[in-house]
Amino acid sequence: MLFFAVLGLLFFLIFFLVLVFHAFLWNLDLGIFSGERSWVSSFECGFLSQRVTENYFSYTYFILLVFFVVFDLEVSLLLNMPLQGVLYKNFFSYLFFLVLLGIGFLVEVRRGYVRWAY
């Protein structure tokens, strides 16, 4: 038992050292990037940017992402109910989850976060 504990600690130590080494290695400025850094940008067609260009996610995209995560969670919970054999034991907690999800969706529609026409 002690052997496995020492082996696990040794593995963790080696993993941590490799992780720290790579973190320092990738963050070193070796003079390669000291000049113009625009060639590293996402515009590889010769476009030289004179200012910082950032891509921001739109709020609509973020809301769509949240909807996807919540409804994916709902589907994964509901599809597993018959397979778990606990359909009637946890039915009210699943029903509460669906009601809470529906109320949240109605609040978002009411406040205008969800627009069906673009």
Curated annotation (Swiss-Prot):
**Mode of membrane association:** Multi-pass membrane protein
Molecular functions per Gene Ontology: NADH dehydrogenase (ubiquinone) activity
Q: Which UniProt keywords apply?
A: Electron transport, Membrane, Mitochondrion, NAD, Respiratory chain, Translocase, Transmembrane, Transmembrane helix, Transport, Ubiquinone
Tell me which Pfam families the record gives: Oxidored_q4 (PF00507)
Query: Which Gene Ontology cellular component annotation is one that this UniProt entry carries?
Result: mitochondrial membrane
* UniProt key word Chaperone: no
Localization in the cell: Mitochondrion membrane
Protein name from the UniProt record: NADH-ubiquinone oxidoreductase chain 3
